[in-house]
């Protein structure tokens, strides 16, 4: 491989057993996944890999030359999750295999439970990439930070002072209820974009693309987010979606610091305990991504990489392992305390329409026959 060649970066994650409860991943699950992926490097299926964790989610980060949605790569991830699930069951871990919602692999893990973010890119002379991993929240949790990275000049100075970025970017937004998508240009359609993505439980940013004239081809994503909703697959609540994202940085794109800056504000996201509460998103190093207080607060980990000319993953650098984010963590804890004091009341608890796929309807159904008309 060399500069100018195509390479694919795949991040595929699943919750296949918590230790204990929903708090973290047992080390034996990581080792099992590493064994499966090591063999895949030896047989040439993938170029390189890293197995990360965030909360109770096992995260597979892989580079290869097989493109997005490759049955070989998705099948490999499924095998790693299946083998790790066997270990989880032997250990009696909580929710063993809970994100594997189908019995057999059918060529693509989309719609089978795991979350997927992938991009096929043309390698630049230097290719800095950040993978983001969230726990106890939903795909819409990325809306605000991705918007700020690529469309907010108060966050990203490059939008003002870098000629390569000054034209703005294109946002691919998915309506995850109607299964439709729209492409919006910024800054021209900024207000239209915000009208959609502010409703983060329905409209989610799936990809960001450069505009024509940018050094990066306009059909190559510069950011991609997993958008799988577990309840749409299972038909009931089986866990929160815990999204992942891949973001490219530098040289006509947001600088590394501009990619990380949105997370200095611990904005409110949906998820937390039983997937039913709003709470702050706390940026943490990987060793602190173990949600315990009320199964939270929700966490985000940022891993930094350089992709070598051979497609190797040079890293990771645990980017939130930095005292510069201590204030964000402290603020997140203050917000956590404030929100928890609401107990079962909104706005800490999600509104009823967002509780449809939780266990609450089963409770409310018992009261249906006891309601009577008000005269």
Swiss-Prot record:
Induction: High levels of transcripts are detected in cells grown on pyruvate or amino acids, whereas no transcription is detected when starch is present in the medium, revealing a sugar-repressed gene expression. Activity is enhanced by dithioerythritol, and is slightly inhibited by fructose 2,6-bisphosphate. AMP does not inhibit the enzyme activity. Dihydroxyacetone phosphate binds at residues 22, 136, 274, 295. This is Fructose-1,6-bisphosphate aldolase/phosphatase. The lineage of its organism: Archaea, Methanobacteriati, Methanobacteriota, Thermococci, Thermococcales. HAMAP family: FBP_aldolase_phosphatase. Mg(2+) 1 binds at residues 15, 22, 56, 98. Optimum pH is 8.0. PANTHER family: FRUCTOSE-1,6-BISPHOSPHATE ALDOLASE/PHOSPHATASE, FRUCTOSE-1,6-BISPHOSPHATE ALDOLASE_PHOSPHATASE. Optimum temperature is over 95 degrees Celsius. The enzyme shows a nearly linear increase in activity between 37 and 95 degrees Celsius, with a 6-fold increase between these temperatures. Is highly thermostable, displaying a half-life of 150 minutes in boiling water. Mg(2+) 3 binds at residues 240-242. Consists of a single catalytic domain, but remodels its active-site architecture via a large structural change to exhibit dual activities. Its EC number is 3.1.3.11, 4.1.2.13. InterPro entries: FBPase_V, FBPase_V_sf. It comes from Thermococcus kodakarensis (strain ATCC BAA-918 / JCM 12380 / KOD1) (Pyrococcus kodakaraensis (strain KOD1)). Mg(2+) 4 binds at residue 241. Mg(2+) 2 binds at residues 56-57, 135, 242. Its cofactor is Mg(2+). Catalyzes two subsequent steps in gluconeogenesis: the aldol condensation of dihydroxyacetone phosphate (DHAP) and glyceraldehyde-3-phosphate (GA3P) to fructose-1,6-bisphosphate (FBP), and the dephosphorylation of FBP to fructose-6-phosphate (F6P). Does not display hydrolase activity against fructose 2,6-bisphosphate, fructose 6-phosphate, fructose 1-phosphate, glucose 6-phosphate, and glucose 1-phosphate. Exhibits only negligible activity on inositol-1-phosphate (IMP). Is essential for the growth of T.kodakaraensis under gluconeogenic conditions. Beta-D-fructose 1,6-bisphosphate binds at residues 22, 94, 107-108, 136, 250-251, 274, 295, 357. The gene is fbp. It catalyses: beta-D-fructose 1,6-bisphosphate + H2O = beta-D-fructose 6-phosphate + phosphate; beta-D-fructose 1,6-bisphosphate = D-glyceraldehyde 3-phosphate + dihydroxyacetone phosphate. GO terms for biological process: gluconeogenesis. Pathway: Carbohydrate biosynthesis; gluconeogenesis. The keyword Transcription does not apply.
């Amino acid at each position: 491989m060399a500069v100018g060649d195509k390479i694919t970066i795949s991040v595929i994650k699943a919750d296949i057993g918590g230790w204990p409860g929903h708090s973290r991943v047992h080390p034996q699950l990581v080792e099992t996944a590493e064994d499966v992926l090591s063999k895949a490097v030896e047989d040439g299926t993938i170029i390189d890999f890293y197995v990360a964790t965030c909360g109770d989610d096992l995260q597979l980060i892989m580079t290869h030359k097989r493109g997005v949605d490759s049955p070989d790569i998705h099948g490999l991830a499924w095998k790693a999750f299946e083998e790790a699930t066997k270990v989880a069951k032997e250990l009696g871990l909580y929710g063993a295999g809970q994100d594997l919602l189908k019995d057999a692999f059918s060529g693509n893990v989309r719609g089978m439970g795991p979350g997927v973010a992938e991009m096929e890119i043309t390698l630049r002379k230097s290719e800095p990439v950040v993978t983001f991993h969230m726990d106890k929240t939903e795909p819409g949790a990325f809306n605000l930070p991705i918007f700020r990275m690529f469309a907010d000049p108060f966050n990203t100075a490059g939008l003002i002072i870098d000629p390569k970025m000054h034209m703005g970017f294109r946002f691919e937004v998915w309506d995850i209820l109607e299964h439709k998508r729209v492409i919006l240009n910024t800054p021209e359609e900024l207000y239209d974009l915000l009208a959609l993505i502010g409703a983060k439980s329905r409209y989610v940013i799936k990809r960001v693309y450069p505009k024509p004239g940018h050094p990066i081809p306009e059909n190559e994503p510069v950011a991609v987010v997993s958008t799988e909703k577990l309840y749409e697959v299972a038909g009931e609540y089986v866990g929160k979606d815990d999204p992942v994202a891949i973001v490219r940085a530098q040289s006509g794109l947001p600088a590394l610091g501009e990619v990380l800056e949105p997370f200095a504000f611990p904005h409110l996201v949906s998820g937390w305990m039983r997937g039913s509460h709003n709470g702050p998103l706390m940026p943490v190093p990987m060793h602190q991504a173990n949600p315990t207080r009320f199964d939270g607060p929700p966490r985000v980990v940022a891993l930094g990489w350089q992709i070598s000319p051979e497609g190797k993953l040079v890293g990771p650098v645990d980017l939130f392992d930095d005292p510069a984010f201590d204030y964000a963590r402290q603020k997140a804890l203050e917000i956590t305390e404030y929100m928890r004091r609401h107990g079962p009341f909104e706005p800490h608890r999600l509104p009823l329409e967002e509780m449809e796929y939780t266990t609450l309807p089963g409770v409310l159904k018992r009261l249906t026959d006891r309601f009577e008309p008000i005269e």
